[in-house]
């Protein structure tokens, strides 16, 4: 993934994978004709192709004719998918192929291949009556990457923690003069020299932090922990030299008894609880910002499907907020009474039961269904076209559940004020509605 992709884009990718895992886990097939294949980044396509050719030979000996044919068919499908790639993508490759049995009892072929959003270091080939998604689930478990700066009087260490993987990015030592009681008339001069050395040390730490933790003008970490003994970490967090983009990412200041690697390990232990709550805190902040716009009545907000989609089309949505379980379907219908027009509807499960939505009001002719998909899925695929960022939230925090219950689980923070009421009136006027008649 390129460094330009923001954490919001990454969250959308994660949501797509979660959705995919859910549908794959529910799928079941007859016999062992469902193939799960995961190829790690450094592997060779040629090795996997040879392994599949060997498997094809082995599968030809399966006694049950039906099972044999479906396994051979699945292996052939995987081979065709592999031919689309000249080499394994940077993050590895995941392929699921096979024949599943739908709820109606019909057989349906499934062919899925994609590159995960971060490197997958698992090699897997399995034929079974279900798809194996454990490796994908593990990929989602510990996604956020956190930065650590450990400072003490002897030097500084910069590291990252992602899941269970800790990495030291850089460290340097420093020789700071100690406090002392001698010096006579020079005592003030000594104190000033000491303060200057401290100041230069803090400045160097701030500069190195910017080099390591900022890529393409954006922080490449989800949060930052400042650790150390004495007062250095507080000095750094309040310093003007510390990059404001990183300042906003500081989650916690922790006191550690050591510097260097031991201090890094201690800081990870002490900050563990805060790191678990980061997603939760980010969500609270985002919805808090949305509620602030409403309470201050700035007009720079929208909620509900209609207003939000209208604002999206205007290009005025800066941040689009959606609940992860938004239960609204998007239908594209073709009207045969008026052959050129297509209608887009957004319906809840309750509204779907009312068949009048699918008939033309004037002619009473039933409209043809061209496509149907969950609205959130459509937004996840198209939000970039409207210049918005998409934030997918849960209802686990108090603010999240308030947003879902009170605002229907969809809304947005706008770049500028939009008057939705006058837009609705304009649309009615355009439909031949004359206010003078009333």
UniProtKB/Swiss-Prot annotation:
It is found in: Cytoplasm. Its main location: cytoplasm. One of its GO terms (biological process) is translational termination. One of its GO terms (cellular component) is translation release factor complex. The keyword Protein biosynthesis applies. Signal peptide: none annotated. PANTHER family: PEPTIDE CHAIN RELEASE FACTOR SUBUNIT 1 (PTHR10113). NCBIfam families: aRF1_eRF1 (TIGR03676). Directs the termination of nascent peptide synthesis (translation) in response to the termination codons UAA, UAG and UGA. Heterodimer of two subunits, one of which binds GTP. This is Eukaryotic peptide chain release factor subunit 1. It comes from Drosophila melanogaster. The lineage of its organism: Eukaryota, Metazoa, Ecdysozoa, Arthropoda, Hexapoda.
């Amino acid at each position: 993934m390129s460094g330009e992709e923001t954490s919001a884009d990454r969250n959308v990718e994660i949501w797509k994978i979660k959705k995919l895992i859910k549908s794959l886990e529910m799928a079941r097939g007859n016999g062992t004709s469902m193939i799960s294949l995961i190829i790690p980044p450094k592997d060779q396509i040629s090795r996997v192709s040879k392994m599949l050719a060997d498997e094809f030979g082995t599968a030809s000996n399966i006694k049950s004719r039906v099972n044999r044919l479906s396994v051979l068919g699945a292996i052939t499908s995987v081979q065709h998918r592999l031919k689309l790639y000249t080499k394994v993508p940077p993050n590895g490759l995941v392929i699921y192929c096979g024949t599943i049995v739908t709820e109606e009892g019909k057989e349906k072929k499934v062919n899925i291949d994609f590159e995960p959003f971060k490197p997958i270091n698992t090699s897997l080939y399995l034929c079974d009556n279900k798809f194996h998604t454990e490796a994908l689930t593990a990929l989602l478990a510990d996604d956020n990457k956190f930065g650590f700066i450990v400072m003490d009087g002897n030097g500084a260490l910069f590291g990252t923690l992602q899941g269970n993987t800790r990495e030291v990015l850089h460290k340097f030592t420093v020789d700071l003069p100690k406090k002392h009681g001698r010096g006579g008339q020079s005592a003030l001069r000594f104190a000033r020299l000491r303060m200057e050395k401290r100041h230069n040390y803090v400045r160097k730490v701030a500069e190195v932090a910017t080099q390591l933790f900022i890529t393409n003008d954006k922080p490449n970490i989800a949060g930052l922990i400042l650790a150390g003994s004495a007062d250095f970490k507080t000095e750094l967090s309040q310093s003007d030299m510390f990059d404001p983009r990183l300042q906003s990412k500081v989650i916690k200041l922790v006191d550690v008894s050591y510097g260097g690697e031991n201090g890094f390990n201690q800081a990870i232990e002490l900050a563990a609880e805060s790191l678990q709550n980061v997603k939760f805190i980010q969500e609270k902040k985002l919805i808090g910002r949305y509620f602030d716009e409403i309470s201050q009545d700035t007009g720079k907000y929208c909620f509900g499907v209609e207003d939000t989609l209208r604002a999206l089309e205007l290009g005025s949505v800066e941040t689009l907020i959606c609940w992860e379980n938004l239960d609204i379907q998007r239908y594209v219908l073709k009207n045969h009474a008026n052959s050129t027009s297509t209608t887009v509807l957004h319906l809840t499960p309750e509204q779907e039961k009312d068949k009048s939505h699918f008939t033309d009001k004037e002619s009473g002719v039933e409209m043809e269904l061209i496509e149907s998909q969950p609205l959130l899925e459509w937004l996840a695929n198209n939000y970039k076209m409207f210049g918005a960022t998409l934030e997918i939230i849960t209802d686990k925090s108090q603010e999240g559940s308030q947003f879902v219950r009170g605002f229907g689980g969809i809304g947005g923070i706008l770049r500028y004020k939009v008057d939705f009421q006058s837009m609705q009136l304009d649309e009615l006027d355009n439909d031949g509605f004359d206010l003078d008649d009333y």
